[in-house]
Regions:
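Active-site HxH/HxHxD metal-binding segment of metal-dependent hydrolases
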Residues: 1-33, 70, 125-129
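Short flexible/disordered coil segments
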Residues: 26, 30, 50, 163-171
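Proline-rich intrinsically disordered, low-complexity coils
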Residues: 4, 16-19, 45, 57, ...
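Intrinsically disordered, low-complexity regions enriched in small/polar residues
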Residues: 16, 25-27, 34, 61, ...
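Phenylalanine-focused residue identity feature
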Residues: 14, 23, 32, 71-75, ...
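Accessory terminal helices/loops
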Residues: 90-171
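Metallo-beta-lactamase
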Residues: 38-126
Length: 171
C-alpha cells in the first residue's frame, strides 16, 4: 500500500525490453496514433544530426526536447554547424506556424515559450555576426563557448531567451 514512491518497484513494473531489430527510426513526415492522440514527427537537425520534434495537434503542443531550448548544445561532432541549425529552425518554424500554443522542452521545468525558435534563430544570427559574449564553457572534457552571458540561474544577462553553447569551428 502507500504512495507510489513508497511501494517496492520490481521488474514486472517495467515494459519488457524489445530486441533492437523491432525498433524503427523516427523521421520527418512520420505520424502515429496513440488512440486518439496523434504524434507528428518533424526533422530538426542541429543539436544532433537526427534531432526530431514532435507535434501533438489535438493538444496544440510541440515537444522540442533538446532540439531547441534555453541552453542548446551545438559544439560536438554530432551537431550540425550553426548555419545549418539556423536553416533547420527557420524551416521548422514555418512548418509549425499556427499549429501550437504550448512548448515542452527536455530541461529545466520542461516549459518553453511560444517564440523560443525565433529567439534561438536570433542567437544563431548573432553568432554568425560575431555579436556574442563567448563565455568559456566545459562539459565532459569538451570546451565550448556560451553565446550570451548568463546569470547564476542560467538565464541570459541581457534578458533575452534562448542561448547556444557552440564552437567557433562549427559556425
Amino acid at each position: 500500500e502507500g504512495t507510489p514512491l513508497e511501494q517496492e518497484v520490481t521488474a514486472a513494473d517495467f515494459i519488457p525490453e524489445a530486441p533492437c531489430g523491432t525498433f524503427r527510426d523516427l523521421k520527418g513526415g512520420d505520424a502515429f496514433d496513440l488512440g486518439g492522440t496523434t504524434i507528428e514527427i518533424y526533422d530538426c537537425p542541429g543539436h544532433t544530426l537526427g534531432s526530431v520534434v514532435m507535434l501533438i495537434p489535438e493538444e496544440r503542443s510541440v515537444l522540442l526536447g533538446d532540439a531547441c531550448n534555453y541552453f542548446t548544445f551545438m559544439f560536438d561532432d554530432y551537431s550540425t554547424t550553426i548555419t545549418e541549425y539556423e536553416e533547420s529552425l527557420k524551416r521548422l518554424s514555418g512548418e509549425l506556424a499556427g499549429k501550437f500554443d504550448t512548448v515542452y522542452l527536455s530541461h529545466g521545468d520542461g516549459n518553453g515559450h511560444k517564440e523560443i525558435m525565433e529567439d534561438v534563430i536570433a542567437v544563431c544570427e548573432d553568432i554568425k555576426a560575431g555579436n556574442t559574449d563567448d563565455i568559456p564553457f566545459s562539459f565532459m572534457g569538451k570546451r565550448a563557448l556560451v553565446a550570451k552571458a548568463v546569470t547564476p540561474q542560467m538565464g541570459r544577462r541581457d534578458g533575452g531567451r534562448g542561448n547556444i553553447v557552440y564552437s567557433k569551428d562549427r559556425i
